[in-house]
Amino acid sequence: MAKGKDVRIPVLLECTACVRNGVNVNKASTGISRYITQKNRHNTPNRLELRKFCPYCYKHTIHGEVKK
């Protein structure tokens, strides 16, 4: 019996350091770290940013929400 859109929506988080700098060329594996999570639209209407571990940068970096 839900009315309208769901409050919790799935979001995709992407490493901002990998996107900005490109991934290290001297490393064996290249790519961009992505996480899938969900957020409550009423509590956090703006873009979500979390500190997560990036396996390509080998450190904790800021992962920002990506538009689908």
UniProtKB/Swiss-Prot annotation:
GO biological process assignments: translation
Main location as per UniProt: plastid
Compartments where found: Plastid, Chloroplast
PROSITE patterns cross-referenced by the UniProt entry: RIBOSOMAL_L33 (PS00582)
MF (Gene Ontology): structural constituent of ribosome
Name of this protein: Large ribosomal subunit protein bL33c
Coiled coil, from the record: none
Protein family according to the UniProt entry: Belongs to the bacterial ribosomal protein bL33 family.
Pfam families: Ribosomal_L33
Signal peptide boundaries: none
Keywords for this protein: Chloroplast, Plastid, Ribonucleoprotein, Ribosomal protein
GO cellular component: chloroplast; ribonucleoprotein complex; ribosome
Alphabetical list of InterPro entries matching this protein: Ribosomal_bL33, Ribosomal_bL33_CS, Ribosomal_bL33_sf, Ribosomal_zn-bd
NCBIfam families with a match to the protein in the record: PRK00504.1, PRK00595.1, rpmG_bact
Gene behind this protein: rpl33
